[in-house]
A protein has these predicted regions:
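Single conserved hydrophobic/aromatic residue that forms the stacking wall/gate
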Residues: 1-14
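Generic N-terminal leader/processing signal
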Residues: 10-11, 35, 42, 76, ...
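Membrane-helix exit/interface motif
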Residues: 13-17, 39-54, 81-84
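Interhelical loop and helix-boundary elements at the membrane-water interface
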Residues: 14-29, 149, 156-160, 164
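Active-site pocket-lining segments that scaffold enzyme catalytic pockets across diverse folds
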Residues: 21-45
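Hydrophobic transmembrane alpha-helices
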Residues: 53-171
């Protein structure tokens, strides 16, 4: 019973409903996100619905094992980074510079983690559907990270100059 209660507490603690100042999303972004999920849901559902192409032995292939490892790393980066960002939220709406963990290297490690998760899915399924989801995710998150990175630099004079937007030491 304690495990279930802890799971419920975690779900409530991490819920978007709990955020003090949730940012408003433009309608166009919401519509594009909806369309993105419809298209990718169709491609991946169609691919995974014809699962007869995968045998149980497939799970011992190098690409599946590598994909699982990448997914674990990506999920850890994503969740830990989101928790750091959530801890910075204040009731006053004041912005703070995120520090520590992957924030030492990039402004948006949560986006990096999500990209790694979908890269892992593409590697695990070794499919065009998985690859397309990874590419769509990158096409969405990389420009957002670059724009957000520029915003951080304009908002904070003390923002770390050597920190990249999304990929450590690269972009």
């Amino acid at each position: 019973h304690n495990g279930r209660r802890r799971q419920r507490q975690m779900c409530i603690r991490d819920s978007p409903l709990r955020q003090n100042n949730p940012a408003k999303m433009p309608l166009l972004i919401a519509i594009l996100a909806f369309l993105f999920n419809i298209v990718n849901g169709y491609f991946n559902g169609t691919h995974l619905g014809s699962i007869q192409g995968y045998s149980i032995e497939f799970m011992s292939n190098w690409n599946f094992i590598l994909g699982v490892c990448l997914f674990i790393v990506g999920a850890y980066i994503n969740i830990k980074s989101d928790n750091i960002l959530l801890s910075l939220r204040s009731k006053s709406g004041e912005y703070k510079i995120p520090e520590g963990f992957m924030f030492r290297y990039v402004s948006f490690p949560n986006y990096l983690g999500e990209i790694l998760e979908w890269m892992a899915f593409a590697v695990m399924t070794w499919s065009l559907a998985g690859l397309s989801f990874m590419i769509w995710t990158m096409a969405n998150l990389v420009p957002r990270a670059i724009k957000g990175h520029q915003w951080y630099h304009s908002k904070f004079e003390s923002y770390p100059k050597d920190r990249k937007a999304i990929f450590p030491f690269i972009i």
